């Protein structure tokens, strides 16, 4: 099967890789978690062990460093936070144009839910998954699932 036989999404996915992810306290800028791992692989459930103190932060800054061989007209992602398979939160982020053969860092700020809506870490631990779908316009590139453990 040649590259001409791949769908647009498959072609982008083949050359797409997450190099690392960093979570920072949005107020202080201090790194609270970092992982040099490609979380974009669609056929596995990834795991992340994040410090429990993340649940007490007002906002978290997320940096995704990624590389792509193909250009993308409108790189965006949809992210769902699920508790035992049920959607708790959903966010939509848009980066825009990404050039071919580039490495990029995308930073987004995520604000915490109101304290009255927060659940204790012992309830959340291992029961929360983050499902991230990466798109170029409406073309699905890959879908990643990460299960969270609080340490």
From Swiss-Prot:
Pfam families hit by this protein: GMP_PDE_delta
Location in the cell: Nucleus; Cytoplasm
GO biological process, one term: sensory perception of light stimulus
A Gene Ontology term for the protein's cellular component: nucleus
Predominant subcellular localization, coarse grouping: nucleus
Keyword field: cGMP, Cytoplasm, Nucleus
Record carries keyword Cytoplasm: yes
Coiled-coil residue windows: none
Family: Belongs to the PDE6D/unc-119 family.
Oligomeric and partner information: Interacts with Pde6.
Name listed for the protein in its UniProt record: Probable cGMP 3',5'-cyclic phosphodiesterase subunit delta
Species of the source: Drosophila willistoni
């Amino acid at each position: 099967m040649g590259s001409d036989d791949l769908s647009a999404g498959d072609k982008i996915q083949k050359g797409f890789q997450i190099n690392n992810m960093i979570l920072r306290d949005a107020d202080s800028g201090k790194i609270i978690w970092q992982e040099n791992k490609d979380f974009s692989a669609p056929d596995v459930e990834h795991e992340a062990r994040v410090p429990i103190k993340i649940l007490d932060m007002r906002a978290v800054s997320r940096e995704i460093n990624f590389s792509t061989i193909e250009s993308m007209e409108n790189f965006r992602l949809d992210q769902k936070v699920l508790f035992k398979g049920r959607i708790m939160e959903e966010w939509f982020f848009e980066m825009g144009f990404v050039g071919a053969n580039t490495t990029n860092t995308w930073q987004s700020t995520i604000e915490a839910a109101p304290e009255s809506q927060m659940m204790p870490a012992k309830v959340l631990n291992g029961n929360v998954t983050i499902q991230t779908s990466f798109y170029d316009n409406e073309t699905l590139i890959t879908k990643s699932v990460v299960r969270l453990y609080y340490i």
